[in-house]
Every structure is written in C-alpha cells, then in structure tokens.
Amino acid sequence: MEYINPIISGFYPDPSICRVGDDFYLVNSSFEYFPGIPVFHSKDLINWEQIGHCISRPEQLTLRQGVPNCVGIYAPTIRYHEGIFYVISTNVAYGGKDEGNFIVWTDNPYGEWSDPVFIDLPGIDSSLFFDDDGRVYYTGAFDNGIFISELKFSYKYDENGRVTDMSCDVVSDRKVIWNGTGGNDPEGPHLYKINGWYYLLISEGGTEFCHMITIARSRDILGEYESCPRNPVFSNRSTSLPIKGTGHMDIVCDKFGDWWGVCLGNRPITYPFKHNLGRETFLVPMVWDEGGWPVIGRDGLLDEKLTENCLVGLFKSR
C-alpha cells in the first residue's frame, strides 16, 4: 500500500488538524477569499472531503474593506475540547474593519460556526492549548518570537446544557517562551503535552524555500524551553526532492497511538523554482526517539510517495 502527496492539492496552506474518535478534521488559511477557512473531514488521513467553511456569512467578518491581496485570514488552528470545536485565526487587514485574532466555535463542524470572538492579543499564527488542569493558553508569533498568554472562557447554556454563546478574556501578561533556533520569522506555534513534557513546535526560515520545522520542550508550560539537538527536525531545503518549502506543521495521534504531521509545501515545475498551485497540504509519519524527540518523515525529509514501510497502525489495519 502507498499514498502520494499532497493529500489536499491546490491552494490549501497552513494546515491544522485534530482528531475526535475515529474522525480527523483539518482547516487551512484562506486569506482574502470568501467563504473563509475551509473545513475538511477524513477517516484515514489520506482521503479528505470538504464539509464547509468556518466563515460562511458576510456578517461574520468583513473581508471587502482594507484587505488587499495576500492578507486576510491567516493560519487557523483547530482544536476540540469537551464537545466544542474551536478554530482560532487572525484577520490581517492593515487597519481595516474586523482586524485581529479571533475564535469561532461550533458543536457541529458540518454546520455553521459562531460569530467571531475577538481576543485582545497581537501577532499572527494564533493557537490554542487546553491543559489537563483546565487552564487554556494562547500562543502566537509576534516581534520575532513566540509568546504565551492564559485565556479564560465563559459560556452560556440552554436548558439542555448546550453552549449557546461564549466570551474569552486574556488573564495573564504575554511572555516570550522561545525565539527559535535563529532562523528568520519564527511562527506557526503549536503546544502539545506528551508524557509530561510541553512540546512547542514552530516554523522558521520564512514560508519559501528555506522553510523548516523546529521544536523545543519544557516541564513547565512557561519555560524554560530546551531546543531539540537535531533541529531543524523537518525541512526539504537544499535537497533535490520535488516538494519544496515544507513547514507550518501540526501533529496528531491516531487511535492506534501512531503520530502524523500535516504541513504545507509546494511543487515547483521550473527552475528557478516556480509553482502554480500554491502551497498545498501534505502528510508525513513521525515517531519518537529514545530521548523523547520526534523523528519526522524520512529522517526529517518529506517524500512525494510513501510506501507501506512508512505506514503504521491506521493503514496496515485496513
């Protein structure tokens, strides 16, 4: 058995993924285009069906005024917690209406999503992390670093206990927790708690051909974070591989305990490198080494074709 990357072809950059039971859900950036933030569903991580958009009503978010080419909705993150799907993203509008970081939510990803709940924090590439002690954290990229702030959600319920509305307050100061390994533009942060460690996965090098993934970890969510000695842990830079610009990764564990990453990349058709399908969504397997650090893809590289030797659990069971 094999599969061929990309798993979602065409203009679908900045993928983020979550799993609920047997189901995987994925979202992408949509920039100035409406409807915004496409939502996909899959049972096997290979075959994906688009099931809707997070921004589907003009009154949700203004994209017509002050939103030039290549700005708008940046880098959404999707997370699921206690029956609610959350998508956090940034509307970059250069001072236009509805600019800033926001959350939309739903209990049914096939239906409509809420109006945006704006968050008074700067930067781009916002992400949510629900800790096992009930606290919620925001990470974002700002001023050439990755920062964290604590959030507090308040909910309203109907008579059946279903959430009907929510608000979100920032309840701590911002703290820079990592500046990366020295690459340009540290961004795209995601936090995970695995075996007692807080792992901070980010992108560096810019979203062109020097793109790379780096990772750090800490026993305390606020740091200090130690950098992986093998950073960057994932990049196709300076190789002859057909997929270029790999980065902006989110990771997920399947029901068999196997780990996978989704990332963006592009497929140039000429040299100097030019690509006409934009940044696409790719899938890569990963494992953890004896020291507790991820080994992503083929020793940090993304191949176009993955064979059965790379496929574990989820696919070998079929």
Which residues fall in each region the model found?
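Carbohydrate-active catalytic/glycan-binding domains of CAZyme proteins
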Residues: 1-318
